[in-house]
Structure formats: structure tokens, C-alpha cells
């Protein structure tokens, strides 16, 4: 489950690409924000997951990206753009995780770190990674409205993952204070 990235924000991400030799920068089609990863699913589970996700009620919200980060402290393997802290985004991620758990998937063991992966790396030059992080530390995207989340499928190819939207779920519900 993920958020699709609007074109204006994707263009901003494309401007951040470069400066790290050997980095495999994500294409426009690969850009998304994962809310919850579940791995391979059989047909019966797919239907239950679809029903559970369709029942989620959460309001639309504004989102913006600010700053960058890396996964892999000693040996960086990913560069990403960070989402500004957002209670409604966190609320949606918790709702998605709970819905998936109710249909038999294990709860996500990872802390939700709202981000969009920009590049994947193997044995990068650490100086170049640090330079890239410093150069883009204060970068900020335009703000945009998140009014849906999607169920994606992915297929690994020699050019990286190919993502496809399988289903879109509109956000709806109370627009005041957030309750869990």
C-alpha cells in the first residue's frame, strides 16, 4: 500500500538526482511512498486485503517533502526524500497496518518512516553520499493533497522494480481531530 506521487513532486525529486556515482536513481514510474509492504500474496488473501483496505475511513490531507536521508548508517544503500511530520499520514499508515493485520498478515515490525526512495546503492563513495545529503538537506517540495492511497503490485526486473496500481482507495471521513 502506498501513496502515488503527483507529477509536480516527481519533477522535484528528479531534480535531486545525481552526484552519487553508482547510484541507481528511481525512474518517475518507480516513485511512491510506501505505507505498508506485505510481500507476496495469494489470490484469496488479495480479496480479503482489498475488502479490508476499502473499509478504511481517513480524511484527505496536505503533504510536503522536506529534507533527505539514507538507510544504512555505516554502509548506505538507499537515499530518500523525507515527508514533513504529519499526524494524518501517520494515522493513515496505522489504519492500513491494522486493516492488513486483521486479515492475517503480521503487523509491520518496522517503524514507519515516511519517505520516497530516490536511489538505491551498492558500496557508494561515502564522501559523495555525505555531500549529496548536505546539498539537499533543506530541499522542499510543493505541498499537495493526498486524497487516496493505492494497492500496488511489484515485479523485480533487471532494471529495478516495476510497480503497478492494482486498486485505488479514496480517503474520506471526518476532517476534524484524529481518533484511532
State each model region's role.
Residues 1-180:
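Histidine-dependent nucleotide/RNA phosphoesterase domain, centered on the 2H-phosphoesterase fold
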Amino acid at each position: 500500500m502506498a501513496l502515488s506521487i503527483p507529477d509536480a513532486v516527481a519533477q522535484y525529486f528528479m531534480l535531486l538526482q545525481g552526484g552519487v556515482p553508482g547510484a541507481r536513481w528511481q525512474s518517475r514510474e518507480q516513485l511512491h511512498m510506501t505505507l505498508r509492504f506485505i510481500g507476496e500474496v495469494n489470490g484469496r488473501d488479495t480479496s480479503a486485503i482489498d475488502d479490508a483496505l476499502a473499509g478504511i475511513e481517513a480524511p484527505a490531507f496536505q503533504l510536503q517533502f522536506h529534507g533527505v536521508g539514507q538507510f544504512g548508517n555505516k554502509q548506505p544503500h538507499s537515499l530518500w526524500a523525507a515527508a514533513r511530520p504529519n499526524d494524518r499520514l501517520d494515522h493513515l499508515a496505522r489504519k492500513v497496518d491494522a486493516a492488513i493485520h486483521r486479515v492475517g498478515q503480521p503487523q509491520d515490525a518496522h517503524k514507519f518512516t515516511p519517505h520516497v526512495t530516490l536511489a538505491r546503492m551498492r558500496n557508494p563513495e561515502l564522501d559523495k553520499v555525505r555531500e549529496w545529503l548536505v546539498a539537499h538537506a533543506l530541499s522542499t517540495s510543493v505541498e499537495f493533497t493526498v486524497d487516496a492511497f493505492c494497492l500496488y503490485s511489484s515485479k523485480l526486473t533487471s532494471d529495478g522494480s516495476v510497480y503497478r496500481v492494482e486498486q485505488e482507495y479514496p480517503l474520506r471521513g471526518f476532517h476534524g481531530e484524529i481518533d484511532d
